[in-house]
Amino acid sequence: MLFRSVIYRSFVTNSYTNIASNGSFNALVNSGIIHPTAVLICPFIGATPNVGFGDFQWKSPFDTCPATMSPLSLTNLQVGIGGQNVLNSTLNMTYENFLQQVNLAEQLTSSDFGVSTGLISQSYWEMSKWYFVNVERGILADKLQPRNINVSFTNNSNVPIDVIIFTFYSDQLTIDVETGIVTK
């Protein structure tokens, strides 16, 4: 029999609403994810009546969101995989930190560019912040075990926020070339 393996990336989303101004956020975002590769945190202005939208920012026809974000600040950022912190210390993310995290995303070899080809400038990132953490470190045996993903941060903005957290992970399927049967 002749088999071919297909490795692909998929993602899971979670949304959290009404994180107070200067409030802390700490949550188990996903449980049992095998081979997580990245966590993307997208903050939006909260849907509370005090802010004026009355609905989610990303649903408003008068806002360019989600194509662009708001310059919302998250401090003391930390992502934990299986009880181990990914970042050496809690992070007050700057554009340089963002580039360090994004630099290895989708990079197959050391000569690949990945996604760090300069399409996201510093001024664009500062006015449209999202927070990317590359979690693809570790040995293969650890990656193949189900892991819990924890995210914590402080909302350093003057308004309540909502966040959507994307958890990216690698998955694999096998195709029997002779019969066309696909197995996971």
Question: What do these predicted regions represent?
Answer:
Residues 1-184:
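Flexible assembly/topogenesis modules
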